Amino acid sequence: MSMPFYISPEQLMADRADYARKGIARGRAVIVATCTEGIVFATENHSQALHKISEIYDRIGFAAVGKYNEFEALRVAGIRYADLRGYSYDRSDVTARALAHAYAQTLGTAFTTESKPMEVEVVVAELGHDASRDEIYHLSYDGSVAQEHGCVVIGGDQDTIDAVFRSSWEPTMSLADTLTAITQALSQPPQKDAEHTMVTPAPTYEAALLDRSRPRRTFRRLTVTDFVPSTQGTRS
């Protein structure tokens, strides 16, 4: 009589975590950071149709890396949650903290009970009426939540990108200077390719800002002109 195959709970959770991390690492990194104008989200994204950065509600933005169909389902669920809560109570009752807790429940349940964990990493940010009230929440594949201060990098070679970005970024920077620091950080080659010279296409950025100067719906997408420093007075 053959013995039943046994996997310890510790090994099962470790395998699930490794599976999710590998899926997330294949995605291009996203940087979320504060600046004087608000909270900026940015990533490299060559697709014009599939967004990794989106609006959830008046003062709340969403960014994710990993499997697109999974984080898109989270985004849609977040919008429905926010709309229902804002309609049932008051628009001011819709907060990033409550949304992060709802996402944590979904991610945690999938990690422990579903056939496979969700291959996603999520950031939810809420713009405060002043910089001291800005809130940034980082959610991992297992449902764990961390409140970040100032900036966070998810996906890709996040350790290298985070180190490069923090070396040149300050929370009191302008939007233009913050975007310059972001592009420098995102242009870092992955560690495994650092010793190889590769010809790559020019990066295409997806970026958005929760704009503190806007009274209600603060989310606005940034264009390529926002990434180009002003060149007034340089005619030849």
Curated annotation (Swiss-Prot):
Can you tell me which family this protein belongs to? Belongs to the peptidase T1A family.
Name of the protein described by the UniProt record: Proteasome subunit alpha
Q: Which gene encodes it?
A: prcA
What organism does the UniProt record list as the source?
Answer: Jonesia denitrificans (strain ATCC 14870 / DSM 20603 / BCRC 15368 / CIP 55.134 / JCM 11481 / NBRC 15587 / NCTC 10816 / Prevot 55134) (Listeria denitrificans)
Give the superkingdom in one word: Bacteria
How is the protein's activity regulated, according to its record?
A: The formation of the proteasomal ATPase ARC-20S proteasome complex, likely via the docking of the C-termini of ARC into the intersubunit pockets in the alpha-rings, may trigger opening of the gate for substrate entry. Interconversion between the open-gate and close-gate conformations leads to a dynamic regulation of the 20S proteasome proteolysis activity.
According to UniProt, this protein's pathway is: Protein degradation; proteasomal Pup-dependent pathway
Q: Which Gene Ontology CC terms are recorded? A: cytoplasm; proteasome core complex, alpha-subunit complex
Subunit organization: The 20S proteasome core is composed of 14 alpha and 14 beta subunits that assemble into four stacked heptameric rings, resulting in a barrel-shaped structure. The two inner rings, each composed of seven catalytic beta subunits, are sandwiched by two outer rings, each composed of seven alpha subunits. The catalytic chamber with the active sites is on the inside of the barrel. Has a gated structure, the ends of the cylinder being occluded by the N-termini of the alpha-subunits. Is capped by the proteasome-associated ATPase, ARC.
Q: Which biological process, per GO, is one annotated for this protein?
A: proteasomal protein catabolic process
